[in-house]
Amino acid sequence: IPVIILDRQVDVQDESLFTCWVGSDFELEGKMVTEWLREYIIAKNMNPSDIHIANIQGTIGASAQIGRTKGLAKAARENGWDLLAEVTGDFTQTKGREVMISLLATYKELNVVYCENDNEAFGAIEAIEAAGRKAGSNLAAGEIMVISFDGVKKDAMQYVFEDKISCIG
């Protein structure tokens, strides 16, 4: 029976256990999103050192987490952004909310949250709003920019239209 792996890669000794893998280049996704962020910062005449990012990572070791984390880490180094924290949200809304509550309490300067999937972004937005802050693209007005990945849930696109999610990779 042919086995086709979708989305996440698997690490096995015997590659004959599956026929093929179909999925994204997750590091390239991270590169594309951070390139969008870089262009946004330039367009708004912002100083790159004024960008303070928290990465709500997916489940540690998942291929999407590894690639998306690498994409952000490399861009932060190259662009002089302040990468405040990398914490796992396990690709869930509940954990994304819990982690964001902690990040907001710890890092007052936090102005960009890079969520490695939509569920984490939804949780982060809930936490931002519960803290009396606003998720949005106007960093000069104190809003917190939310970046997400996948865009597979209807709410993700609605949040883009409402400017609660600034970019989906």
Question: Where are the language model's segments positioned?
Answer:
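A residue-level marker of the well-folded mature domains of exported/periplasmic proteins
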Residues: 1-169
